[in-house]
């Protein structure tokens, strides 16, 4: 998915164990391999936390904007030890923020508002946002960064459970889209769906 062309955001959605975190790790590693810095946000345990300390990874934050590796002297949003995502990306024109389990981040929290600002400025900048989460929860998000990310109608819909899952991207799903093994789903680009099998990281 071209975040510059279809972005500045893409959504990876599916039920638990559908491969959405693996797809997000694969996307993050692909970006890092191309020299694009990545800021990772993971409110709960996620394979993305393994990227901490990797070259090009600006930081790996939890749902309270604290580094998962410890440290950090800021008090972002009034939380001791929390880091300001906007400060972490400052000085980088090109970067991507990868957020796993996005539905767990309140749109009204300091972190949620910072992610919203990153998405808003990405429309005219060279940075983007990759958001992963549960299909149902993301489909019912009506404000904040997750709702704004959906508006581009671009991303992955993994392990489709029902035709209503297409509501996330405001698309009608093709027949036979329901079911399949983990990683099976639809690539949706600007509202057009194509069947895919997501790659898994090495």
Please provide the spans of the model-predicted regions:
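Phosphate-binding and hydrolysis-coupling loops of NTP-dependent motor/remodeling domains
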Residues: 95, 132-133, 139-202
